Amino acid sequence: MFPLLAFRGDRMEILKAKGIVKRFPGVVAVDNVDFEVYENEIVSLIGENGAGKSTLIKILTGVLKPDAGEILVNGERVEFHSPVDAFKKGISVIHQELNLCDNMTVAENIFLAYEAVRGQKRTLSSRVDENYMYTRSKELLDLIGAKFSPDALVRNLTTAQRQMVEICKALVKEPRIIFMDEPTSSLTVEETERLFEIIEMLKSRGISVVFVSHRLDEVMRISDRIVVMRDGKRIGELKKGEFDVDTIIKMMVGREVEFFPHGIETRPGEIALEVRNLKWKDKVKNVSFEVRKGEVLGFAGLVGAGRTETMLLVFGVNQKESGDIYVNGRKVEIKNPEDAIKMGIGLIPEDRKLQGLVLRMTVKDNIVLPSLKKISRWGLVLDERKEEEISEDYVKRLSIKTPSIYQITENLSGGNQQKVVLAKWLATNADILIFDEPTRGIDVGAKAEIHRMIRELAAQGKAVIMISSELPEILNLSDRIVVMWEGEITAVLDNREKRVTQEEIMYYASGQKKQNGRVA
């Protein structure tokens, strides 16, 4: 008997999941979900953290077994016991955390764990056909426009190049479907454009792509369909032509959300931090700027512009070669982060997991970590009760979703981890807060909360510096915008009337300098 195939228009349904259920202790992660993929399409799967997207992907790619439901490939029912089973059926996946071996070559990584002998599964006794492995790897690299050799060591590649290797790994068995989980989270604007070109090329060759991202502008641009999940359930889908940011956000969070806050007025006051002629290697070149109490100063620019490097000098992580730093009008020397903390400066770093938190510590311990000397008795004996009071206070103030202050921080969602980083600096009474990519990798609801917090902190009189690669974030949250290119400031733009455009920022971010002085 031939399998019953479903079609949408003239496109055949190549993957169908029906009534998928997955339970974990105390939670139904995926609740009776249907999901389908048609040939030659790009379908995005979106939802907040905890919506069930990752669990569903793991089921459809053989990492997890469902508790109920069925999966059909080309109309035939299948059971996946491992990712290899899914791979054999033409389903590949590229995870957000790239899974490569640094000390192996590109070609070895492409064939790792699958097939390095022609037509055979690799075993310990197999003789690796290195010529075939090199030739096939070169074909795949050429297909996606990669400019590096199959013999290159992976440890020497950039993040974007590593992702190209992952795409080649996914293509090595000529799949019908590739799942991509947050593929643009660590890419520059140019690298993201190149990835989208690759995705469109894959679609033209008959390969469907399931795209998972928190970046709604990317989702709406690249997708033929958008499927929305919330609380483990499939909420609905939208087709191209029906995409609308407000509609998508409401489907994701179940309520109206003000993505960028309105009506939170800031009144810039005295200069809180001033930097004059800061220099460091060839990364920061004579940088001068000031941020006032009660304002949000946005820093825009492409990757490599020197924004993060500048703030690491201000925070004392790196040592300036020349230049001066003034806090509240007083010249200061900041030789390390401890000096910066004493000056009332807090840094919410780009990589919260590596630089902002100790993931294996509790929420309480992370919040009080920079304040231990201040809240301990005689600077020696920890005051457990005081630690609990401070932690409970900031968990409540910032609406951090955690079972208790004794929850291990690693178990929180990305948005709540970001709030813990913010809480620890607010607990030090920092008056100058530096946010580096504050909403990277967090879902829409949490983004809206962070956006509101940034504006509210400025309204309370804090001096806020915000680095962001998301131009809508820069344009909607900043009172003034500093644009950098290759370590230099090319423009400072007045954005109090919210009249600066993305085109204007990109003009200066590409190296063009503002004439007739800076607009302050």
Swiss-Prot record:
Localisation per UniProt entry: Cell inner membrane
Membrane topology: Peripheral membrane protein
Ranges for domain ABC transporter: 15-256, 266-511
Keywords from the named record: ATP-binding, Cell inner membrane, Cell membrane, Membrane, Nucleotide-binding, Repeat, Sugar transport, Translocase, Transport
Segments crossing the lipid bilayer: none
PANTHER family xref list: CARBOHYDRATE TRANSPORT ATP-BINDING PROTEIN MG119-RELATED, D-ALLOSE IMPORT ATP-BINDING PROTEIN ALSA-RELATED
EC main group: translocase
Top-level lineage group: Bacteria
An annotated Gene Ontology molecular function: ABC-type D-ribose transporter activity
GO cellular component, one term: plasma membrane
Binding site for ATP: G47, E48, N49, G50, A51, G52, K53, S54
Lineage, opening ranks: Bacteria, Thermotogati, Thermotogota, Thermotogae, Thermotogales
Enzyme Commission identifier(s): 7.5.2.7
Name of this chain's protein: Ribose import ATP-binding protein RbsA 1
Gene transcribed to yield this protein: rbsA1
Catalytic reactions of this protein: D-ribose(out) + ATP + H2O = D-ribose(in) + ADP + phosphate + H(+)
InterPro entries assigned to the protein according to its UniProt record, in alphabetical order: AAA+_ATPase, ABC_carbohydrate_import_ATPase, ABC_transporter-like_ATP-bd, ABC_transporter-like_CS, P-loop_NTPase
Signal sequence bounds: none
Similarity remark: Belongs to the ABC transporter superfamily. Ribose importer (TC 3.A.1.2.1) family.
